[in-house]
A protein has these predicted regions:
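Acidic, Ala/Val/Gly-enriched low-complexity intrinsically disordered segments
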Residues: 3-7
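Intrinsic disorder
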Residues: 12-15
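Low-complexity, intrinsically disordered or signal/transmembrane-proximal segments
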Residues: 18-20
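N-terminal accessory/capping or targeting/presequence segment of soluble
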Residues: 24-129, 133, 137, 141, ...
Length: 184
């Protein structure tokens, strides 16, 4: 019985490793597709929050672009993709989950609120140069957030550009459909 259980556990472990390996390859393909889009648009970095146009934390599948690009399924987190780096910022509720889900993806985990963790703005300032462009999907940022981001980065000669459509809708890879409108 013990040997049987060990074989089941080993088989399950091999299956999980296979899934994670292939999921990481898919994540890498998605990041490569996003980077190709950014290059075409003249954008050097893209910020992908976990929100929808209502700035909700829990969103319909269509608005889970951060989950789609990173594979991280926690409800809170922000991904930043540059031409050569990728990072995910999340809070302590999700540190362990993020470590597991990002493993092998090439996305670095930034643990928010820890003294050694750079903020997203610090990361952008450190990794971009003057005349760089940071892209956002303006539908999922508040006006206040977008203006603050724009003003802060402008001090370093970095501009912010809103891309009208969700970034994953522009890639050649499959993504969730927009939810139907309610007709109450």
């Amino acid at each position: 019985m013990k040997a049987e259980n060990e074989e089941i556990i080993n088989s399950f472990t091999r299956l999980l490793n296979y899934i994670y390996k292939n999921m990481a390859q898919t994540i890498n393909q998605r990041i490569d597709a996003l980077r190709a889009l950014l290059k075409r648009e003249g954008i050097d970095a893209f910020i992908i929050p976990s929100t929808d146009p209502h700035l909700s934390e829990y969103v319909a599948p269509y608005w889970k672009s951060r989950e789609w690009i990173s594979g991280f399924t926690g409800s809170a987190g922000t991904a930043v993709i540059t031409t050569d780096k990728a990072g995910l910022w999340t809070d302590s509720r999700y540190f362990l989950q993020a470590e597991q889900q990002l493993e092998g993806s090439g996305i670095d985990l930034y643990k928010e609120m820890l003294p050694e963790t750079p903020s997203i703005l610090d990361f952008l300032r450190e990794n971009l140069t003057a005349n760089s462009v940071v892209g956002i999907d303006g539908k999922v940022f508040s006006t206040t957030q977008a203006i603050a981001l724009q003003e802060d980065l402008a001090k370093n000669g970095i501009t912010v550009k809103s891309i009208a459509d969700p970034m994953y809708g522009q890639t050649a890879l499959p993504c969730p459909k927009h939810p139907p409108l309610s007709t109450r």
